[in-house]
Amino acid sequence: MLMWGLTGPIFGTIADKYGGHKAISIAFLFYIAGIYFLFSGPNTGIYFQISLGVLIGIGCGGTAISIPMAVVGKHFPLSNRTIAMSFVTAVGSFGYFLSPIFTNYSLQNHGWVQTLIYFMFFLIVGLAISYFVRSPSLNQSTETTNKQNSLSALKEAFKTKSYVLLIAGFFVCGFHITLVGTHVPKYVIDRGLEDWTAAMILSLIGLFNIFGSLISGYLSTKISKKIILSVIYLLRGVSICLFIFTPPSTISSIIFGASFGFLWLSTVPATSGIVAHIFGTKFLGLLYGLVFLSHQIGSFFGAYLGGLFYDLYGSYDYAWYLAIALSIFAGLIHLPIIEKPVLRLKEEPVLRLKTE
């Protein structure tokens, strides 16, 4: 999670400066190498950490949602940018829905080595497709008015209160997602439910996130994005409360999987849309990459603290209480965000594709 987050801004900078296909292609090479060494290397802890933790972590930094989101965002004007971004999230969610189903089938029928080979093949296909990714360029007359570099873009962003609030809010998003994704399987078993219930919850999350992302993207063109984010985070707290305070059952698990899935990554179109609206799209890869770094730091703590609380107290209760408190925190801190472009930003230009 941390390597994924730390390399996101680096790949974002590469995408901003040299083009999206270069950043994504480099990341795919790391990802493929990590998968290859995972099934072909020695079965030792350090080798496992290098392949899975470092190489695959770096690969995720450039192939996961933040970089494709930034690349797509550059192609669309403000009026429909968040809708376009929501489609990126929705397609990724469809993969999240299919992945556990395919993985479980392949592990049972072919074993883990062959399963990893299948995944490596999928990544090679992704590498080939990434060659066709193209970034837009501004028309020449407008490029001369925007002489910002990466450093000045960072200084401007961190002097902007709304950007800092977005970073804090996305930390909570990462905490929620990894707490649920990592610890719900153990939690539902501890409550006396079958292990297939956990797989069902995760699959429902992936499925309903498709709809949540698309609806969030559409609503972001109609109403304030900060209000959408506040509502999403507060509803996450409600969903968690209903899940942990109602008697365990298959029905309650289905309701939680569907409701939390609807809210899962529906934060992404609105969050990335605010970043693009405030600062423009020239350094969207870098600036959104840093917001996503906060998300991954939150993911680290969601996974770590969930396990720590369980080891200390023998239950996940305190982890869930913290998640609910963070929902309230995130719901409130988005309200002061000002959804207006910085004074530097000129009228957004018409984009045209360039051949890289």
Language-model segments: what does each one mean?
Residues 29-43, 235-248:
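C-terminal ends and interior cores of transmembrane alpha-helices
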Residues 46-63, 171, 252-266:
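Hydrophobic core of transmembrane alpha-helices in multi-pass small-molecule transporters
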Residues 155-216:
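Extracytoplasmic gate region of multi-pass secondary transporters
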Residues 87-138:
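Helix-loop-helix hairpin linking two adjacent transmembrane segments in secondary transporters
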Residues 205-208, 222-274:
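C-terminal transmembrane helical hairpin of 12-TM major facilitator-type secondary transporters
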